[in-house]
From Swiss-Prot:
SUPFAM superfamilies in the record: Diaminopimelate epimerase-like
Molecular function, one GO term: diaminopimelate epimerase activity
Source lineage: Bacteria, Bacillati, Bacillota, Bacilli, Bacillales
Reaction(s) the record says it catalyses: (2S,6S)-2,6-diaminopimelate = meso-2,6-diaminopimelate
Provenance organism: Bacillus subtilis (strain 168)
Record-marked site positions (Could be important to modulate the pK values of the two catalytic cysteine residues): 168, 217
Protein's gene: dapF
Any Pfam family the entry gives: DAP_epimerase
Protein's name according to its UniProt entry: Diaminopimelate epimerase
Gene3D superfamilies per UniProt: Diaminopimelate Epimerase, Chain A, domain 1 (3.10.310.10)
Length: 284
């Protein structure tokens, strides 16, 4: 294979190169290498990573996500919305509500269609996992990490840990513009307490239904948005008594807004945009 067709899409500026594996079938042994290549802003297309839209024996489509460092992720909220848009618009599905398989399990997506195009997608992200063993954290166990003080070098932060199929640690901050992403993000991501690494979020509370959010993503660094991170931030806000279950929480990310609702049935709903940037052929 010397080339393949791709579609670049983004959810609130969190951009990936999407490859339709129903048609292209990139070789398994080269996926990490290709993800690194296409993600480069200098010698590739430029993105936060690569997402494959694959056949599935459990759902109409399966999503596989590769970060820009070549590592494979388990889940991606912004990616799910874009996969849903792609699947509907390219007639991989016919219904407006359908399942998508991920490495974290099955999720349900519902697309809002206008003139044949999808602009807004709601995804049922499932139930958050809160125990240290589920995150995972090194000390394991069934305890939760809620409003817990942790030391990272000489810096102490108070955080809440949430898994949305991938691990997150959420820290409150008084001024989101002062979030120490570049200095503490890579340190916390690779802290030995988190054996699989972790996504790092700083959150400023405006009120019980409005949060400002910045993220350092595991394997990608600073990004414009993180859908699972926004879900984790809303869940953490509820766990810390700031927000309530079963209410819409608007999360302001660098790339735009997501609406998150942690329902009484335990499921977290995420609603936001998905956009196509361009299509083309990539030469290997």
């Amino acid at each position: 294979m010397n080339s393949f067709r791709f579609t670049k899409m983004h959810g609130l500026g969190n951009s990936y190169i999407y490859v339709n594996q129903f048609e292209e079938q990139l070789p398994e042994e080269k996926l990490s290498e290709i993800a690194i290549q296409v993600s480069s802003v200098y010698t590739g297309i430029g993105s936060d990573g690569m997402i494959l839209i694959c056949p599935s024996d459990q759902a109409p489509v399966k999503m596989r996500i590769f970060n820009n460092d070549g590592s494979e992720g388990k889940n991606c909220g912004n990616g799910l919305r874009c996969v849903a848009k792609y699947a509907y618009e390219h007639k991989l599905v016919e219904e407006t509500s359908f399942l998508i398989e991920t490495l974290s399990g099955l999720v349900k997506a519902e697309v809002q269609v206008e003139n044949g195009k999808v602009n807004v997608v709601t995804v049922d992200m499932g139930e958050p996992r809160l125990t240290k063993s589920e995150l995972p954290m090194l000390d394991g166990g069934e305890e939760h990490t809620i409003n817990e003080t942790m030391a990272f070098g000489e810096v102490e932060l108070t955080g809440t840990a949430v898994s949305m199929g991938n691990p997150h640690i959420v820290f409150p901050i008084a001024d989101i513009e002062q979030a120490p992403l570049t200095t503490l993000g890579p340190v916390i991501e690779k802290d030995p307490r988190f054996p699989e690494g972790i996504n790092v979020e700083f959150v400023e509370t405006v009120n019980e239904q409005e949060l400002h959010f910045r993220v350092w993503e595991r394997g990608s660094g600073i990004t414009q948005a993180c859908g699972t991170g926004a879900c984790a931030a809303a869940v953490a806000s509820v766990l810390n008594g700031v927000s309530k279950r079963n209410q819409d929480i608007t999360v302001h990310l660098a790339g735009g807004d997501l609406v998150i609702n942690w329902k009484d049935n335990g499921h977290v709903m995420m609603t936001g945009p998905a956009e196509t940037v361009c299509e083309g052929v990539y030469f290997l």
